[in-house]
Amino acid sequence: MDRIMMKVGNEALAFYEVGAREYLTCIEHIASDPENYFYRLIPAIVNLAFSIELSFKTFINEVDAKKCRHDLQKLLECVGNPIKDILVEAVITKMKQCDAAFNEESFWAYLDQNKEAFEDWRYYYQRGKIADITFLYDMATVIINVVKRTKRAQETIEQR
């Protein structure tokens, strides 16, 4: 991960922290006040989706990143192995905590449904679509942890 990609990783972390905080607050209270907390989930969706996008972009070249724009599915497909396989497996494991039947087929179906969540939800009043906030949160959590580990490894190498 070069210096520019490390900066993108830092940006991804910032968007993740805001999105995760809002998600965790809203999920806790949405059953008691759905109208108020539904609208507070919108920034969580946008921030989590954007953090995933930026995280994926830390692992691919700039040309592919520009080509894929905000499409999470295309971005993930550009991430090389073994990172892509590790990410997919980790998200599946995390999602199984909510849905024991969640598998690789489910992963790709959910990713397809949420692939443009950033674009779909940043202007919700124009074209908000269905998004699975739990999937976005779990995926963002997994990828952010990989970005953090990669950054630490890079910093260790640079210190030598």
Across the structure, where does each feature detected by a protein language model lie?
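Conserved beta-strand->loop/alpha-helix structural units within folded catalytic cores of enzymes
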Residues: 46-57
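Charged alpha-helical initiation segments
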Residues: 1-44, 59-63
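Structural signal for well-ordered, non-membrane alpha-helices
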Residues: 24, 28, 52, 144-151
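Long, charged low-complexity segments
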Residues: 1-13, 17, 64-160
